[in-house]
């Protein structure tokens, strides 16, 4: 009974941590490949805002100077320049019968600079996004907005932190 309480407590703590996280993301599988998991967040350094994008995949990495191209549902176009701020990998193995199958996951993070005026455009909703990566670009088209309005809300929260200091 005590172990059930501990497990339940840990589950609630983990759920609470995930609820406080200021990220928005999606999983994308193109052409039956392994796909990737994308996460986006908003950060502020001094007076500059940026969108921080992280990809977790079996092979995709950001280029050294990546670009993020965004088309909104109203047809407006944004092109953001960025820099890579981190690359990493994790390896594990899956046991199938008496064979160990190696599994490697690559994580790459890039930071894209954005102005408050561009955040206003993002609030219209993101219809399409393209990120320059290697070995191939990541491109996703949305039928409904999944990231635009949320990124705008994250921007508003970052802006309020300065105003309420």
Predicted feature locations:
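Bacterial Sec-dependent N-terminal signal peptides
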Residues: 1-25
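Sterically constrained small-residue positions within well-ordered secondary structures
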Residues: 12, 42, 59-61, 101-103, ...
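An ectodomain-focused feature that recognizes extracytoplasmic/extracellular
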Residues: 22-72
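Short acidic/polar mixed-charge low-complexity motifs
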Residues: 36, 74-76, 136-138
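Ser/Thr- (and often Asn-) enriched beta-sheet segments in non-cytosolic proteins
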Residues: 41, 52, 67-69, 79, ...
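Beta-strand elements of well-folded, non-transmembrane domains
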Residues: 55-57, 74, 116, 135
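Extended low-complexity, serine/threonine- and proline-enriched intrinsically disordered segments
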Residues: 64-92, 131
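Internal interaction segment
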Residues: 86-165
């Amino acid at each position: 009974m005590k172990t059930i309480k501990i497990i339940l407590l840990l589950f609630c703590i983990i759920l609470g941590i995930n609820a406080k996280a200021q990220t928005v993301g999606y999983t994308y599988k193109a052409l039956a490949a392994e796909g990737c998991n994308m996460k986006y967040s908003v950060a502020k350094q001094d007076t500059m805002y940026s969108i921080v994008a992280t990809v977790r995949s079996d092979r995709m990495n950001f280029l050294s100077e990546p670009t993020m191209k965004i088309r909104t549902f109203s047809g407006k176009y944004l092109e953001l320049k960025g820099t890579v701020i981190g690359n990493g990998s994790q390896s594990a193995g899956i046991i199938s019968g008496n064979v160990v199958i190696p599994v490697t996951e690559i994580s790459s993070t890039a930071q894209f600079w954005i102005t408050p005026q561009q955040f206003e455009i993002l609030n219209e909703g993101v219809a399409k996004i393209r990120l320059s990566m290697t070995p191939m670009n990541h491109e996703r088209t949305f039928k409904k907005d999944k990231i635009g309005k949320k990124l705008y809300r994250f921007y508003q929260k970052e802006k309020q932190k300065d105003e309420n200091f």
